[in-house]
């Protein structure tokens, strides 16, 4: 990669530990039909990450201090925003299809006031097999009003994708630094950190552009953060808190009744089975 070239877009890879999926992610970024800048950001430097950095030619930036989701994501975003005006925090478990950057830049060309870009995604298991991602099917329904790009700068339209659950897949998001200044993540949540952030951004100037075409793949597996948050009941606690910011207590209770059923569906997806989920 030509490090002196100016890129409008940067993939800031949030790397942690020694994930076996990290090389697959980096390869998917290398295979983009339109080149972007790629950097690797970590709070857990090790020989494995250094080796992959040398293999792919992507520089590594190290954050000093203990590992933490908010701190790591904010660091990746800040490093990316110093290099490009559009930043994607690439999750090490996931994959980006070859035309992700192409679609992103095309959307930005038509809507320069775009604050957040997102897209449909496929769901894959630990082996990379496409599985029934029931949660993404529900998210598509939540995102219906975002199809109207001409009015996607309205707060009501942006919030429509977030009011009854997070209809936007966090790994699919790219943020426009002009409208989304650092620090991007300003809450202390472990699971709904992205949902709460998107709600804040929906209330601020800027347009949410969603492309209803699979441009990436989200991986579910036993070691994923989502699974850990289900097992320790943190997901339920945090989702209830965010719903209460948007709805009355009775409405929140009804929504949580269905959301708790969704936790079992995530386990089913992880096992390669089918299920219905709302989150």
Predicted region positions:
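Conserved nucleotide-sugar donor-binding catalytic segment
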Residues: 144-235
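Glycine-rich, basic loop-to-helix element that forms the pyrophosphate-binding segment
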Residues: 64-82
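N-proximal low-complexity "stem/linker" segments adjacent to membrane-targeting elements
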Residues: 1-28
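Conserved donor NDP-sugar-binding/catalytic core segment of glycosyltransferases
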Residues: 101-139
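Active-site acidic Asp-centered loop
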Residues: 43, 90-92, 118-120
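A conserved acidic beta->alpha catalytic loop
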Residues: 41-50
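Short beta-strand-to-loop acidic/aromatic patch adjacent to the donor-nucleotide binding site
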Residues: 84-95
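Short, acidic, metal-binding catalytic loop of nucleotide-sugar glycosyltransferases
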Residues: 27-36
């Amino acid at each position: 990669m030509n490090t002196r070239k100016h890129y409008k877009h940067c993939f800031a890879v949030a790397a942690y530990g020694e994930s076996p999926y990290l090389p697959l992610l980096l390869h998917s970024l290398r295979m983009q039909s339109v080149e972007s800048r790629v950097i690797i950001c970590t709070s857990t430097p090790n020989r494995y990450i250094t080796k992959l950095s040398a293999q792919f030619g992507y520089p590594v930036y190290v954050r000093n201090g203990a590992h933490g989701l908010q701190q790591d994501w904010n660091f990746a975003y800040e490093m990316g925003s110093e290099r490009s005006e559009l930043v994607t925090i690439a999750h090490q478990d996931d994959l980006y299809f070859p035309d992700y950057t192409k679609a992103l830049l095309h959307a930005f060309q038509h809507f320069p006031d775009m604050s957040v870009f997102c897209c449909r995604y496929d769901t894959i298991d630990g082996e990379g097999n496409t599985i029934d991602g029931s949660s993404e099917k529900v998210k598509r329904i939540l995102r219906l009003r975002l199809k109207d790009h001409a009015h996607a700068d309205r707060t009501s339209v942006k919030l429509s994708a977030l009011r009854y659950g997070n209809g936007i897949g966090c790994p699919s998001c790219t943020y426009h630094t002009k409208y989304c200044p650092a620090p991007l993540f300003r809450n202390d949540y472990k699971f709904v950190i992205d949902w709460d952030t998107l709600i804040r951004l929906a209330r601020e100037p800027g347009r949410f552009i969603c492309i209803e075409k699979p441009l990436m793949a989200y991986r579910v597996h036993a070691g994923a953060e989502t699974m850990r948050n289900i097992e320790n009941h943190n997901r339920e606690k945090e989702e209830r808190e965010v719903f209460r910011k948007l709805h009355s207590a009775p409405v929140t209770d009804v929504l949580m009744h269905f959301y708790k059923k969704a936790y079992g569906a995530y386990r089913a997806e992880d096992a390669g089975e089918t299920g219905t989920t709302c989150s």
